[in-house]
């Protein structure tokens, strides 16, 4: 029997026969129907979408220091108050998840930091 033939046979079943088929498949293979999981997951996705729309705190992440590493280090020191070695180490982490220049800042402050870093030649991402 081909898959198409199986689908045709399933299409001809009544609702009660489909319910019985699902029950037998669950018992036979030790699984449960996925529909309740999908229904439960839907509100979570909606909540995540709402949270993104209302985002008020941002992380400033250095993606690349570009051609002018020294200038980017100077700007990072100015923004963060780090020492020279710490700022250099942070700039050299560009492109990694650890390259967070500042976290939990307002949108305005994040945009200002991004502008300063981009003027120094860096590539920056706001999350």
UniProtKB/Swiss-Prot annotation:
Alphabetized UniProt keyword annotations: Ribonucleoprotein, Ribosomal protein
Subunit structure: Homodimer. Part of the ribosomal stalk of the 50S ribosomal subunit. Forms a multimeric L10(L12)X complex, where L10 forms an elongated spine to which 2 to 4 L12 dimers bind in a sequential fashion. Binds GTP-bound translation factors.
Gene Ontology CC annotations of this record: cytosolic large ribosomal subunit
Gene that encodes the chain: rplL
InterPro entries in the record: Ribosomal_bL12, Ribosomal_bL12_C, Ribosomal_bL12_C/ClpS-like, Ribosomal_bL12_oligo, Ribosomal_bL12_oligo_N_sf
GO terms, biological process: translation
Identification of the protein by name: Large ribosomal subunit protein bL12
SUPFAM superfamilies per the UniProt record, alphabetical: ClpS-like, Ribosomal protein L7/12, oligomerisation (N-terminal) domain
Family: Belongs to the bacterial ribosomal protein bL12 family.
Single GO molecular function: mRNA binding
